C-alpha cells in the first residue's frame, strides 16, 4: 500500500511500517544506486523528507524532544549530500531554462557542469556513511512508544501543519522574498506528505486536497530552484567573460520566477482559504467512526 496507513491494521503498527519502509527504501538506494546521474541523491532525500513528515505526526504521543532529536539525525543524513544535490539542481535548472527558452548559455553551462563534477568526486563515498546511520535510525524507530497513539492526535498535528502553512503564506504575501517562499514551501510539502499518510480516512476528499498541495508545492519548488540558481549566478557578477550570458539568464530567471510566485500565491490563497479551526473540525469528522 506504500506511504499510507491502513484502516485494518493497528495505528501504531501502520506508522512503524511506514517508518521502516522509508528507511529501507533509502538504504536500498544507497546500496544499489541508480545509474542515472542525480537520481539516487534525489530519491534518498525524498524518502528522508517523507519519513520526517510521518515522524512529526507522532509528536503529541512521543514528545517534542524525542521527535526533534530524531529529526535532527535524519537531517544530518540528508546533509551528507546537500552540496552535491544543490550542484545538480542548479545544473538541471539551467538545462531546463535553456531548452524551454531555446537560448544557449555555453559558458555558464560549462561552469555549472564542472562544479557538479567536482562535488560528485568530493562526495563519492556518501552512501557508505549514510547506510549505518539509516540502520541505527531504523532500530531506534522500532522502539518508539506508539501503542497508545490515536487518530485524533494525528489529525491534530495535521491541523497544526495547515495553520503553520497559513501563517507562512501570510508572511510570503507580505515579504515576497525567496526565503519566505522557501519556508512556506516546506510547510506545503509536509502537509502533502501527511495527507498521503491519512488517505484511508476519506480517500475521495483527502486525495483531492493532497493533489492540490502537490501542485502548490511543485510551483514553489520550481520558483525555489530559480531563486537558488540566481543566487549562485550573482557570485559571478565580476566575471567579464560571463557578462552577456549572465545578463540574459538573470533576466529570464527573474521573469519566470515572478510568474511562478504569482501562480503559487493565487493557488495558495485558495488552498488556505478555509479558517484553520474549520479545517481542523472538518478533518476531525473523518475520525468519528474510526477506532483509535
Language-model regions: role of each:
Residues 1-292:
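Function-determining surface determinants
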Amino acid at each position: 500500500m506504500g506511504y499510507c496507513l491502513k484502516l485494518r491494521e493497528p495505528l501504531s503498527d501502520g506508522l512503524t511500517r511506514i517508518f521502516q519502509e522509508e528507511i529501507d527504501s533509502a538504504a536500498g538506494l544507497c546500496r544499489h544506486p541508480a545509474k542515472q546521474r542525480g537520481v539516487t541523491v534525489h530519491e534518498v532525500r525524498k524518502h528522508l523528507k517523507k519519513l520526517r513528515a510521518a515522524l512529526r505526526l507522532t509528536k503529541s504521543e512521543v514528545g517534542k524532544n524525542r521527535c526533534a532529536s530524531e529529526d535532527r539525525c535524519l537531517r544530518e543524513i540528508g546533509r551528507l549530500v546537500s552540496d552535491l544535490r544543490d550542484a545538480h539542481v542548479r545544473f538541471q535548472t539551467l538545462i531546463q531554462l535553456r531548452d524551454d527558452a531555446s537560448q544557449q548559455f555555453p559558458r555558464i553551462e560549462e561552469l555549472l557542469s564542472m562544479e557538479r563534477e567536482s562535488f560528485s568526486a568530493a562526495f563519492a563515498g556518501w552512501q557508505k556513511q549514510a547506510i549505518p546511520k539509516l540502520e541505527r535510525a531504523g532500530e531506534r524507530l522500532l522502539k518508539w512508544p506508539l501503542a497508545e497513539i490515536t487518530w485524533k492526535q494525528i489529525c491534530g498535528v495535521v491541523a497544526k501543519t495547515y495553520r503553520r502553512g497559513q501563517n507562512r503564506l501570510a508572511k510570503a504575501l507580505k515579504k515576497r522574498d525567496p526565503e519566505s517562499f522557501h519556508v512556506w514551501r516546506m510547510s506545503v510539502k509536509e502537509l502533502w506528505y501527511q495527507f498521503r499518510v491519512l488517505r484511508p480516512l476519506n480517500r475521495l476528499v483527502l486525495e483531492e486536497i493532497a493533489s492540490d498541495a502537490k501542485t502548490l508545492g511543485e510551483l514553489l519548488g520550481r520558483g525555489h530552484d530559480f531563486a537558488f540558481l540566481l543566487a549562485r549566478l550573482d557570485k559571478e557578477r565580476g566575471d567579464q567573460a560571463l557578462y552577456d550570458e549572465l545578463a540574459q539568464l538573470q533576466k529570464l530567471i527573474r521573469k519566470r520566477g515572478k510568474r511562478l510566485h504569482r501562480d503559487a500565491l493565487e493557488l495558495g490563497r485558495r488552498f488556505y482559504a478555509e479558517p484553520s479551526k474549520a479545517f481542523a473540525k472538518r478533518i476531525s469528522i473523518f475520525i468519528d467512526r474510526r477506532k483509535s
